[in-house]
């Protein structure tokens, strides 16, 4: 009996020293995650006040992390809710790893959709919320120039703001205004 115990103890020590990973050593990679979102209506006295958006991130081990967003405080019953809570995966910080962009809704009838963005941090193996001084509307990613382009429209006025990364922060570096007809000509 002592021989079996010592042999088992020796085998466990050998496995522990061999560097084999145990389930406790699991570090999630970005590619391990599956994503889904859920838009929940919060009622106050029967009226829609806002929608809460929850993004569920489930890793390869089945562990789920939640990211919370708040949809714009509009009477969303009057809006097309089709894109609210929609998740897109784009590389916002140009590190080659997809980040998450969650639509929080339109600012007005011209679109001007706003988004919450979470960047994958490959050192901490977690998503971290993007902090930006400005509001980014209807964003597009310009991979060639490594910038994020924000477009705001109101009537015939269009404002385009370009953001670039500087010292780990997304900062505005160019702003231009034009008419929608000028934009259509480009």
Task: Give, region by region, the residue ranges found by the protein language model.
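Beta-propeller fold detector
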Residues: 66-71, 128-134, 172-179
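Acidic, small-residue rich beta-repeat scaffolds with periodic aromatic anchors
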Residues: 5-8, 16-56, 139-186
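N-terminal, post-signal-peptide region of Sec/Tat-exported proteins
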Residues: 49-83
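Beta-propeller blade repeat segments, especially FG-GAP/WD-type strand-to-loop junctions
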Residues: 58-60, 110-130, 162-168
């Amino acid at each position: 009996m002592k021989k079996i115990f010592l042999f088992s103890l020796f085998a466990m020590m050998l496995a522990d020293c061999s560097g084999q990973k145990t389930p406790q050593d699991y570090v999630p990679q970005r590619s391990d995650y599956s994503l889904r979102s859920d838009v929940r209506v919060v009622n106050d006295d029967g009226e829609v006040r806002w929608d809460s958006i929850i993004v569920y991130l489930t890793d390869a081990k089945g562990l789920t992390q939640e990211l919370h967003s708040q949809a714009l405080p509009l009477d969303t019953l009057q809006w097309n809710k089709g894109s609210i809570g929609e998740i897109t995966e784009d590389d916002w910080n140009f590190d080659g790893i997809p980040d998450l962009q969650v639509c929080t809704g339109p600012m007005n009838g011209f679109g001007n959709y706003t988004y919450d963005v979470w960047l994958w941090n490959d050192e901490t193996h977690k998503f971290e919320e993007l902090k930006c001084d400005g509001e980014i509307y209807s964003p597009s990613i310009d991979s060639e120039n490594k910038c994020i382009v924000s477009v705001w429209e109101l009537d015939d006025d269009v404002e385009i703001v370009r953001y670039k990364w500087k010292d780990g922060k997304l900062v505005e570096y160019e702003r231009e205004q034009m008419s929608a007809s000028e934009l259509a000509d480009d």
